[in-house]
Amino acid sequence: MTDDYEKLLEKAKNVLSSSTKNIDRLKIPDPEIIREGKATIIRNFQDIVDIINRDPEHIIKFLTREFGTNIVQNGRRLIINRKLTLEELLDKMNEYINTYVRCYECGSLDTEIQKSGRISLLVCKACGAQHPIHSVREAKDDETIEEGKEYVVEITEVGSSGEGRTNYKGYTIFVPGAKRGETVKVRIKKVKNDVAIGEIIERSKQEKK
């Protein structure tokens, strides 16, 4: 049975790879920094902004809060009134991207922020997922799934071989025997990278009727 799950996992990875290989075409360059006195300057700031398609003022507000110093944009450059290392900048830029840009489900960078009342939603143009924006620090302790554990998921699509699929906590879970729109409790049998195989252990009462 273990071999069967291994084969199914490899098949799932191949299917997912072929269907999503062109989704995430965006490549974000590392900040190019120079120092002038006590200031750190990101020379390619606007290039980064153009790629992630976010309001530069939104990014500046985030970095100002994180670094606790004055930050201004000058043309295509960003001037930070503090000495920073490349590692410090990368850490905060990655935190911004993982919170406000990268899809929480499929990982695509092709997203936009939309308002729904007072709630800001991260909407993915690649997979269609919509989620309230939350800090990556808030989700860090609950961002993985584990073999042997049980999760309740809603099946969002069915593959050509009849297996149900869903995105959950950044993983694509393949669930043999599940139908689209069905809510099921699954036990994770195998996990590899961001792909998992789940076994149905309970269907919702509504589905049983």
Curated annotation (Swiss-Prot):
InterPro entries associated with the record: IF2/IF5, NA-bd_OB-fold, TIF2_bsu_arc, TRAM_dom, Transl_init_fac_IF2/IF5_dom, Transl_init_fac_IF2/IF5_N, Transl_init_fac_IF2/IF5_Zn-bd, Znf_GATA
Disulfide pairings: none
Protein biosynthesis found in the keyword field: yes
GO annotation terms (biological process): regulation of DNA-templated transcription
Superkingdom, taxonomy of origin: Archaea
This protein's UniProt keywords: Initiation factor, Protein biosynthesis
Domain named TRAM: residues: 144-202
GO molecular function: sequence-specific DNA binding; translation initiation factor activity
SMART domains in the record: eIF2B_5 (SM00653)
Transmembrane segments: none
Pfam families (alphabetical): eIF-5_eIF-2B, TRAM
Gene3D superfamilies: 3.30.30.170, Nucleic acid-binding proteins (2.40.50.140)
SUPFAM superfamilies xref list: Nucleic acid-binding proteins, Translation initiation factor 2 beta, aIF2beta, N-terminal domain, Zinc-binding domain of translation initiation factor 2 beta
Function recorded in the entry: eIF-2 functions in the early steps of protein synthesis by forming a ternary complex with GTP and initiator tRNA.
Family statement: Belongs to the eIF-2-beta/eIF-5 family.
Subunit structure: Heterotrimer composed of an alpha, a beta and a gamma chain.
Protein name per its UniProtKB record: Translation initiation factor 2 subunit beta
